[in-house]
Amino acid sequence: MSLPTCIVTAALDDAALDWLAGHARIVRGSPTSAEFAAAAAGAQALIVRTYTIVNDALLDQLPALRVVARAGVGLDNIDVAACRRRGVEVVHTPDANTQAVVEYVLCLLCDALRPRLFLDRPLAKDAWDDVREEVVGAWQMDELVLGILGMGRIGQRVAQVAGAIGFHCIYHDLLEIPESARHGAEPCGIEQLFADSDVVTVHVDGRSSNRGLVDAPLLERLRDDAVLINTSRGFVIDDRALAAWLGNRPGAQVILDVHDPEPFTHGHPLIGMANAHLAPHLASRTLTAMANMSWVVKDVAAVLGGAPPRFPAPLR
């Protein structure tokens, strides 16, 4: 009996691919490649990462498809409803990058709050003293309030780690979070979170109602020296409103790891602003996290074998 065909559109960990090869015939290629076109009609599985858009147009090319797998957490690039209308299962790896993202957020907090300087040559005593006078953090973390917008897996781990350092953590979420999962963080309304926080870190999901959630009225509630970090989805923040707010507040900082679109273009309103720091979507970029995401192949094999997947896309 021949193996079902699985198209893989992006790089996966070699060990995961080797394992999958025992359960499916693997074809590697982007949706614009000849390899994809040749295999599409009979493909029963499709594995994507961040930038392959799975919509009706792509699904039309895959009439035998049974499962779409996202080697990652967010499902923004997959039209889950369109898949379900066609009886196609959608699976992902919801906890694969939690540790990586939390570590990255911690690094960004340190970047924002604790200036550092490394020397590549000896300095005279006067210059040494001058540097030490200039490179001074304005606060310690145990003096500050960290507001966590979105208290899912990553938000909860951020609360745990930040609380251990000494931040007083508050959070806002649409759901009631069990006290055991709050790690000492206190719930509040979204307006209060922006008004009371020294630092706001955004960890909401990709539901359409979160588009433009952080808008001009919400930004106006922030303190003039606040720090805003976004490692969730670019479309959550209104970039033009953010640029207008930031331009009048030289003491504030914005660190954006995610953007809408990606990559961002020359017209991005925050380009060139001294207190805006734009990163190319790096939060989950550890070899460990990328390998973890690759093991979505286990759920691909489960679906192809007629078994329920461990991590189906959530119902919304």
Descriptions of predicted regions:
Residues 1-91, 215:
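An N-terminal-biased, well-structured beta-alpha scaffold segment characteristic
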Residues 59, 63-67, 78-90, 202, ...:
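Beta-strand-loop-alpha-helix segment that lines the small-molecule cofactor/substrate pocket
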Residues 94-145:
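Phosphate-binding beta-alpha-beta segment of Rossmann-like dinucleotide-binding domains, i.e.
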Residues 22, 134-224:
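Rossmann-like dinucleotide/phosphate-binding beta-alpha-beta segment
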Residues 51, 73, 198, 203-206, ...:
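Short glycine-/small-residue-rich Rossmann-like dinucleotide-binding loops
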Residues 27, 170, 235:
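Conserved beta-strand positions in the Rossmann-like core of class I SAM-dependent methyltransferases
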